[in-house]
Amino acid sequence: MLLVIPAMLEKERPGHPGLASFRKVIAAHSFSWVGIQTTFVFLFAYLQQALPHLSDIDMGRVGSTSFLVLNAVGALLPAFVLMPIAHRIGRVKTHALSLACMTAGYIGLYLYGTSALQIYILMAVVGIGWAAIVSLPFAIVSQKVNQARMGLYMGLFNLSVVLPQLVVSLGVALFVSRAPDKGVIFAISAVSLALSAISWSMVKED
């Protein structure tokens, strides 16, 4: 947070066009990946608690189907839904709204994810944000940076994925392992995605 807040408040400086916007994108995207990685790593721990009557095989099927639903929505929405919306209202607004939907999905999982069907439905809602995350940020970054240094900026942009994964592995993992209610993973994800949506709303549309 100490690094993110200054980035979100930074203004463009003469001689460095797009640099402040790029830093805001990295900060906003980092929040997204804290929430996503928390789900990826700890969903099965939650299923063991929420669906204790299932065998290991059936629980594995529920987990696999949950991720199938998430990725199916993530694969289909960008071309058929998100891009047409982005052409009308802009990529940044579309992305922020998608993350807001993802936040709602995580809140739903935290409150109501007590059966396989409910989990599938809510994972589909979460998939709206996932669809945006795998498609829109790269297009947004490409608009904001010097095209001659695109490779450098994309490499730096990948840090907004890698560093949150380390945060989850080293910090969130310890917290979740000690939490009596594994549903806390969805609370963490909801807060992270809400912060991401708010942060993206502070990014200027080009």
Tell where the protein language model's regions lie, with residue ranges.
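Pair of pore-lining "gating" transmembrane helices in MFS-fold secondary transporters
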Residues: 21-42, 124
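Multi-pass alpha-helical transporter architecture, strongest
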Residues: 7, 167, 187-206
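Loop-to-transmembrane helix entry
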Residues: 52-72
